[in-house]
Amino acid sequence: MYKITKGLDLPISGAPNQVIETAAAAKTVAVIGPDFHGMKPTMLVKEGDKVKKGQIIFTDKKTEGVNYTAPASGTVIEINRGERRVFQSLVIRVEGDESETFTSYSGSELKSLERSKVVDNLVNSGLWTSFRTRPFSKVPEIASVPNSIFVTAIDTNPLAASPEVVLADQAEAFADGLTVLTRLTEGKVFLCKASGAKIPTTSDVTVEEFSGVHPAGLAGTHIHFLDPVNDKKTVWSINYQDVVAIGKLFVTGELSVERVISVAGPQVKKPRLVRTQVGVSLNDLLAGELSEGDNRVISGSVLSGRKAFGPFAYLGRYHNQVSVLLEGRERQMMHYLRAGVEKHSIMNVFLSKLTGKKSFDMTTTTNGSDRTMLPLGNFERVMPLDILPTQLLRALVVNDTEQAQKLGALELDDEDLALCTYSCSGKFEYGPILRDCLTLIEKEG
């Protein structure tokens, strides 16, 4: 077991009740462009077209052969693009239940499937996009083979759903999905779970337990300790709910888009787990669920999710939670003289440290303006990986890609630096800075 002692469990209020309720059927769903790093679509549908669930709606120009499929049947009502025609989202109004069918197999056949058949089924159904590579956190190329595969069946993000609860009634499909994954690599399939958690498994996978504070549940943490990557070595990671979808695909021949997510945060009236689907409209899902005020809806974690608004107001492809905070637009008079009873600080400069307050109604305020990055030891407190965080972050900020590679940038994804962003007195957003650096490294070598 790996015990993570450096990090932070964010003390935010609005934790969800770990009981699953079924949400109303989705009215609109979407595929969001920025969820897929470096993807450039070739559209196969246009506004007004009817589509079936599982039908290919676009392919990736940059990664030949990768298909993106419709998460529901209905009518394409929007294809949103931003500046320079950058793809933002494709929105489908849900109508009917028509769906494509794919190749199915018996449970006994899964252990001996040829790799090519597994790849074909995943690509045709669009579930190939469930995988993300490390380095670069992109959808893998069709011909690529990973050194190992990591199944993330632990979630230490603030306000997250418990994988143990979500998988309680999905044991068979999850086990089938794990068996399918073993056909994709000659290396190990690591099942990473919380210490003592009752997660279904099979004899063909390697089970590893992690405990302690966030980021104990991130794929980047698991990869760092179990099978570190470099510029010549690639591994893949996949979320536990996508493993369930893969298991169902290969046994039933149908594309499962079900997703159990946490709807939580200080502004949610009834924080809980809901059963919905990939790409669901968050405007519809949260109707009547929020307290009054200027709220920010976040698809994903409060630490590393994205603001869900306009063409992006839908559940992200890789997100298992929706978080809602109050916009922190109001500034307190002479805030620097206040005791900070209602504020959290990792540097223990507020009185809240002495009062023993367990959770805080956090907002989006940064409590100050942009300033110089200061090496105060904060980054070392929240970074459990065997890297030099202050030096790495400095290299990222000045765009020194060569030094960043030497200091471990290739091991990281945006979410791995979220706690560094939270603890930075200079208010730097290290996730986007890392992403720009990784894009440049991939382009220039």
Swiss-Prot record:
Its EC number is 7.2.1.1. Keywords: Ion transport, NAD, Sodium, Sodium transport, Translocase, Transport, Ubiquinone. SUPFAM superfamilies: Single hybrid motif (SSF51230). One of its GO terms (molecular function) is oxidoreductase activity, acting on NAD(P)H, quinone or similar compound as acceptor. One of its GO terms (biological process) is sodium ion transport. It catalyses: a ubiquinone + n Na(+)(in) + NADH + H(+) = a ubiquinol + n Na(+)(out) + NAD(+). InterPro entries: NqrA, NQRA_2nd, NqrA_C_domain, NQRA_N, Single_hybrid_motif. Pfam families: NQRA_2nd (PF24836), NQRA_N (PF05896), NQRA_SLBB (PF11973). It comes from the Bacteria. Composed of six subunits; NqrA, NqrB, NqrC, NqrD, NqrE and NqrF. NQR complex catalyzes the reduction of ubiquinone-1 to ubiquinol by two successive reactions, coupled with the transport of Na(+) ions from the cytoplasm to the periplasm. NqrA to NqrE are probably involved in the second step, the conversion of ubisemiquinone to ubiquinol. Belongs to the NqrA family. This is Na(+)-translocating NADH-quinone reductase subunit A. It comes from Marinomonas sp. (strain MWYL1).
